[in-house]
Amino acid sequence: MPNVKLPDGNVKHFEAPLTIYDVAHHISPGLAKAAIAGRVDGVLVDTSYLIKEDCSLIIVTEKHEDSLEIIRHSTAHLLAQAVKALFPSAQVTIGPVIEDGFYYDFAFERSFTPDDLSLIEAKMHELAKANLSITRRELPRNEAIQYFKGLGEEYKAKIIADIPENEALSLYRQGDFEDLCRGPHVPSTGFLKAFKLTKVAGAYWRGDSNNEMLQRIYGTAWADKKSLEEYLFRLEEAEKRDHRKLGKALDLFHFQDIAPGMVFWHPKGWTIYQELEHYMRNRLVDFGYQEIRTPQLVDRSLWEKSGHWANFRDEMFVTETENRHYAVKPMSCPCHVQIYNHGLKSYRDLPLRLSEFGNCHRCEPSGALHGLMRVRNMVQDDAHIFCTEDQIQSEVAMMLELVQSVYKDFGFTEIKYRLALRPEKRVGSDDVWDKAETALKLAMLGRNIEWVDAPGEGAFYGPKIECSLSDCLGRIWQCGTIQVDFSMPARLEASYVAEDGSKQTPVMLHRAILGSFERFMGILIEHYAGKLPLWLSPVQAVVLTISEKQNEYAEKVRKTLQKRGIRANFDLRNEKIGFKIREHTLQKIPYLLVVGDKEVENCQVAVRTRDGIDLGVMTIDTICDTLTQEIIRKGSI
């Protein structure tokens, strides 16, 4: 006779076993109608799940945080059902939930077309409207293999064959379609009201390029139509802001097959890059960092000693010369320890803050490469601080101050912080971990920072703070990290002489703010839709002539701007001024300075912004002062 404890603390007593749906109906018919699933003693289950013993229960409705994953998984099955109905020869493979949606891979003799997607989506709506019941059953593994082979679903049979022999499997049926799945699922297809198929792409079976190519259909699903429409709007905005398209349109960079995942920077793109580096270099000097430079190619012996060769070898580019094996560095940490080790260190030398714009290479899979966001050659704003355990808190507090200040200058004020805490397998004593975790927490408290704990997600060598930005579309980008490391200094024999004369191992703090310059530039381009703040814009102002008579004056204006440190250009072409304004507006140049006969006569310029705002006429000195002040203000404008 089960006693069921509800979230409000009330306990319901029942005389006989009953389903989640029955409990919901006992509370109210409206709740039963809205119930999507249940969470029994923390485990998600279907509404048909039979409660036989005492338990705690949460009824999951579309308002619950668990609902979207269940809705999306169920919609993936709805997609597979629709494809099988329209294209019976297609074979189903896998259909997981992903961020903001789902996908399903199919083996089919041809590629699905946009017209196919429209037909499939229409069929999905038809099946959802039919409100087909979704039921669950279990089959022994060997029976399940034979069952799917009998249906002609060879891929599904192969998936099941990889599951341990003694394991029972669950299958879900809706109408005449049945698929392998752990569940849970919504009670019926009528719960699936807001979905959209977004694209189709190729995908290798089991992610192996040696296997056959499958057709992957992507989709999104939400609890209601309003949420779906909001998401599709964000998707449309993201498409407009795609840094790869803007990079081409604004002539910033390009990629080529001759160097996969490596950027060819054009003059304007490189100007932005240099501005980032110049800005970061100045900020690091303000915070007491010493800039260093370390080799690109390092003997494998260092990587073996640091542990990278054993754990990171597949992601490293390696080469051999003169019977020695080298690796192009994937990260700078071991090399920074070599600089620390060069010469005896005393406790008086700590903390020692070393920074490098580290040029790193990683052998990312070709399928994972994505514009500037995922590259093989990246420059990281690496820094490593060597300090004592007692200095961790003050150093981390200083890092957090720098992180907040830098992000603000780039226009990011909504920062999310996550504290990755000790995992089960780790180096160092509990006392040391206690001290380090407490130091990180106190440093964040001192900066009035709120954070989320992530138990067990720290690296084996120390806890970590992750700093993530929220962009204008609400997307979260993890950029900054502050990582405590108890392992690498000892591995690489770093030491210092303590106050009592004993030899001690320093703590090493890994710190990045932008992450990789390439990825951060991609984030900036998308956040601002190419309209970068004035201080970052590759061309900050352009002088536009109305006729050839103003050419000499336009050159004088440009030179004056350049002498004042403003990146300026001019357009002396014999084109209509409206054409010039439109062209440079599309190039996202912040200020357009128009000069005609009147402006020449009065030593002025007519000022217009890229957003079409007419600021009137100004003297050359006034526009120089205006732009200079805006550049100085950076992200505070």
Swiss-Prot record:
Protein name as it appears in the record: Threonine--tRNA ligase
Q: Which GO terms describe its biological process?
A: threonyl-tRNA aminoacylation
Q: Organism's domain of life?
A: Bacteria
Q: How is the cofactor bound?
A: Binds 1 zinc ion per subunit.
What this protein catalyses is: tRNA(Thr) + L-threonine + ATP = L-threonyl-tRNA(Thr) + AMP + diphosphate + H(+)
KW Iron (keyword) present: no
Which top class of enzyme applies to this chain?
ligase
Enumerate the GO terms in the molecular function aspect.
Answer: ATP binding; metal ion binding; threonine-tRNA ligase activity; tRNA binding
Please describe the quaternary structure of this protein. Answer: Homodimer.
